[in-house]
C-alpha cells in the first residue's frame, strides 16, 4: 500500500467514524424522544443510557455490517477505490447535518446508502452497485418497516387502553413510566445492533478495497470497538433538535403511548438486525409514534409534521447521492482532490453548526416547543427593519 493510498484509507476511517458520531446524535431521538416527552426519563439520564446501550448493541451482531461490506457494492465486478467510499460518507454527513439543523428525523442509513451509491456510480460505473441487494436489503425494508411498527404500535395502544380503562390516571402514568424505562433502553440497544454496524461495514469495505482484508469477511474486532464508541459518544451529545420533533411534533404522547411505540420499534429493529436488513431506525420509530397517535382515543396526529418528514425520507437517498457523486467527481482526481473535498466538508459543517446557535435546543428546553425554527441573524433583522 503506497503512502497516498494509506492517507486516503486513514481519511476514510476518520470520516466513517465522524459519520457514526453524527448518526449517534442525529438518531438519539429514536430511542429516547418519547421517554423524554412523557417525563419517564430526565433528558440527560436518557442520553447517557442511550449512549451506553448503543455501545453494547454494537457488539451483539454483525449481520448488517456484512450487508454493507459485501452486499450493496459489487467490489468483485469493479475496482472500488477508498476515495469513492470517502466521497459517499461526505454526502451522508452533510445531509445528516442539514436535517439535524432543521430538526427533521430523516434516515442516517439512507443518507449513507445514497451517498455511497452516488459516489460509486460516478467513480466505478453503474455496474459497481448491486441494485438487487439495495432493493431487497434497503429499499423494501424502508417501505415495510415503518408500516409494520406503526400497525404494531396502533394495536398495542388500543389493547393497553382497553386493559387500563378502570385504572386511575395516576396508576396508569406511574406504571407505564417504569415500563418506558425498559422499552426505551431496548430501543437504544437495538439501535446499536443496526446503525453502528453500517459504519463497521463501510470501514470493512474500505479494507477489502485496498486488499487489507479478504472479500466476504466480516468486521474485525477493533472496527467493532471503535464504531461502537463513536456512535455512543455521538448519542451522549444528545440530538435535542430531532428529539423535540419526534417527542412533541408528531402527536401528544402519553406514557402508555410511549411504552407501545418503543416496544414496537425495538421488536421491529431487533428482528431486522438479526436478518441483516439495513433499515432506517428513524422511520421505524416515527411510524410507531404515528401508530400510537392514531390508536389513542381522541388523540390527533400532526400531519403537517408527518408530511415534512415523509418528504425528507423521499429526498434523502437521492440528495445524499448527488452530494456523494459531486464529492467523488473531485476526489477521484487524486489525493489533492480528496483533501479538497475534506476541506469543503469541514467548512460546510462549521457553517451548519454556526447556524444552529441561532436557535439552540438542549436538555433544558427540548420540551418547550414542538418544532425547530432557524432564527434569522441579528444583522438580517436590522437590515429588514431598515
Spans of features found by a protein language model:
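Multi-pass alpha-helical transmembrane bundle typical of ion/small-solute transporters
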Residues: 1-386
Amino acid at each position: 500500500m503506497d503512502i497516498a493510498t494509506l492517507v486516503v484509507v486513514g481519511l476514510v476511517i476518520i470520516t466513517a467514524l465522524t459519520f457514526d458520531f453524527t448518526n449517534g446524535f442525529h438518531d438519539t431521538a429514536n430511542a429516547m424522544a418519547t421517554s423524554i416527552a412523557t417525563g419517564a426519563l430526565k433528558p440527560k439520564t436518557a442520553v447517557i443510557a442511550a449512549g451506553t446501550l448503543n455501545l453494547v448493541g454494537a457488539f451483539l451482531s454483525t449481520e448488517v455490517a456484512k450487508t454493507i461490506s459485501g452486499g450493496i457494492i459489487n467490489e468483485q465486478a469493479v475496482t472500488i477505490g477508498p476515495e469513492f467510499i470517502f466521497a459517499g460518507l461526505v454526502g451522508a454527513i452533510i445531509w445528516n447535518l442539514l436535517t439535524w439543523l432543521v430538526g427533521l428525523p430523516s434516515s442516517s442509513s439512507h443518507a449513507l446508502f445514497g451517498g455511497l451509491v452516488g459516489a460509486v456510480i460516478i467513480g466505478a460505473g453503474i455496474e459497481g452497485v448491486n441494485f438487487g441487494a439495495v432493493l431487497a436489503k434497503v429499499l423494501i425494508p424502508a417501505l415495510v418497516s415503518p408500516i409494520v411498527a406503526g400497525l404494531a404500535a396502533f394495536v398495542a395502544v388500543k389493547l393497553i387502553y382497553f386493559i387500563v380503562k378502570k385504572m386511575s390516571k395516576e396508576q396508569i402514568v406511574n406504571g407505564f413510566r417504569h415500563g418506558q424505562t425498559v422499552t426505551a433502553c431496548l430501543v437504544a440497544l437495538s439501535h446499536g445492533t443496526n446503525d453502528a454496524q453500517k459504519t463497521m461495514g463501510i470501514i470493512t469495505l474500505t479494507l477489502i478495497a485496498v486488499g487489507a482484508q479478504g472479500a466476504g469477511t466480516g468486521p474485525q474486532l477493533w472496527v467493532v470497538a471503535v464504531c461502537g464508541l463513536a456512535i455512543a459518544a455521538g448519542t451522549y451529545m444528545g440530538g435535542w433538535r430531532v428529539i423535540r420533533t419526534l417527542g412533541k411534533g408528531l402527536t401528544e404522547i402519553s406514557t402508555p403511548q410511549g411504552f407501545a411505540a418503543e416496544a414496537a420499534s425495538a421488536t421491529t429493529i431487533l428482528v431486522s438486525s438479526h436478518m441483516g436488513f439495513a433499515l432506517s431506525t428513524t422511520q421505524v420509530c416515527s411510524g410507531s409514534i404515528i401508530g400510537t397517535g392514531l390508536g389513542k382515543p381522541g388523540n390527533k396526529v400532526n400531519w403537517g409534521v408527518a408530511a415534512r418528514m415523509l418528504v425528507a425520507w423521499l429526498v434523502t437517498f437521492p440528495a445524499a447521492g448527488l452530494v456523494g457523486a459531486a464529492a467523488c467527481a473531485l476526489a477521484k482526481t487524486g489525493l489533492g482532490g480528496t483533501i479538497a473535498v475534506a476541506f469543503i466538508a469541514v467548512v460546510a459543517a462549521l457553517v451548519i453548526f454556526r447556524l444552529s446557535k441561532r436557535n439552540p435546543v438542549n436538555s433544558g428546553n427540548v420540551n418547550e416547543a414542538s418544532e425547530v425554527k432557524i432564527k434569522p441573524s441579528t444583522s438580517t433583522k436590522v437590515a429588514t427593519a431598515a
